[in-house]
Curated annotation (Swiss-Prot):
The keyword Signal does not apply. This is Transcriptional regulatory protein SDS3. It is found in: Nucleus. Belongs to the SDS3 family. PANTHER family: BREAST CANCER METASTASIS-SUPPRESSOR 1. It comes from Saccharomyces cerevisiae (strain ATCC 204508 / S288c). Component of the RPD3C(L) complex composed of at least ASH1, CTI6, DEP1, PHO23, RPD3, RXT2, RXT3, SAP30, SDS3, SIN3, UME1 and UME6. Residues 61-135 form a coiled coil. The gene is SDS3.
Length: 327
């Protein structure tokens, strides 16, 4: 019985609460329904007032919002302007940096090209100097005169091969080219070439001087004896020391070859001048007081190159660093 009483009491409380809520809702509904027209009229009046104020520009809230939007717009425009100016200035700075970088690279490239060009030129100069040194050495070995030898005449060609002696040389020691001349047939062409060049440049008068110089003719058939003594001081001393026998042997060797005598002195009868030369031999060493040695003819670059190649080949050295010209 007690449990039923409690449940009835609880049910009564729930019903009472629900009843109160329903009564409140009904009251609100009735109030709204009764004041519905007034609410709509007030709302419509407020909207019309706002529209009128908006059209007239008297609405403060609307004006404030418009002003805020304008300020925000101006701020964005200023920001955009500053950004454009920044981009323009930055582009100019980057452009100048690119120009400076390009100039630096250009100068660096020019410097590198100059260094390589200078290096190439220096290498070429060094190579040409080496070639010139080799040519000078070849010329010295071919044409230098050694005045320390007590005898002026030197036979570089055998009597059994050609039947006559080659041109005189003042060197007492054989150089590399002289030994090559005695052993190699290729140098015979060079000796003849030098002899022909000397003959073409000096002419008949120089040949007569050479005849006087080699045979010991003091006065000469053309009157050249007055200037022979001073032009060959070294040969004067050497001839004075060597005596008359060497001159006689040399003259006899030349007289044995008629072609050689005609080639050297331009005369076909070597016996005609032999007696006159023997008579004039006893005048002493003063006949060489004024005569100088004939000028040596320089070789052409191709001839020097051939001589150097032949010297290297005979001495067992490697080939020259320069090449022969091919016409």
């Amino acid at each position: 019985m007690a449990i039923q009483k409690v449940s009835n009491k609880d049910l009564s409380r729930k019903d009472k609460r629900r009843f109160n809520i329903e009564s409140k809702v009904n009251k609100i509904y009735q109030n709204f329904y009764s004041e519905r027209d007034n609410q709509y009229k007030d709302r419509l009046t407020a909207l019309q007032t706002d529209l009128t104020s908006l059209h007239q520009g008297d609405n403060g809230q609307y004006a404030r919002q418009v002003r805020d939007l304008e300020e925000e717009r101006d701020l964005e425009l200023v920001r955009l302007r500053l950004f454009e100016e920044y981009r323009v200035s930055r582009s100019g700075i980057e452009f100048q940096e690119d120009i400076e970088k390009a100039k630096a690279e250009h100068e660096k490239l020019i410097k590198l090209c100059k260094e390589r060009l200078y290096s190439s030129i220096e290498q070429k100069i060094k190579k040409l100097q080496e070639e010139r040194l080799l040519m000078d050495v070849a010329n010295v070995h071919s044409y230098a005169m050694n005045y320390s030898r007590p005898q002026y005449q030197k036979n570089t060609r055998s009597h059994t091969v050609s039947g006559w002696d080659s041109s005189s040389n003042e060197y007492g020691r054989d150089t590399a080219n002289e030994s090559a001349t005695d052993t190699g047939a290729g140098n015979d062409r060079r000796t003849l070439r030098r002899r022909n060049a000397s003959k073409d440049t000096r002419g008949n008068n120089n040949n007569q001087d050479e005849s006087d110089f080699q045979t010991g003719n003091g006065s000469g058939s053309n009157g050249h004896g007055s200037r022979q003594g001073s032009q060959f001081p070294h040969f004067n001393n050497l001839t004075y020391k060597s005596g008359m026998n060497s001159d006689s042997d040399f003259l006899q060797g030349i007289n044995e070859g008629t072609d050689l005598y005609a080639f050297l002195f331009g005369e076909k009868n070597p016996k005609d001048n032999a007696n006159g030369n023997e008579k004039k031999k006893n005048r002493g060493a003063q006949r060489y007081s004024t005569k100088t040695a004939p000028p040596l003819q320089s070789l052409k670059p191709d001839e020097v190159t051939e001589d150097i190649s032949l010297i290297r080949e005979l001495t067992g050295q490697p080939p020259a660093p320069f090449r022969l010209r091919s016409d």
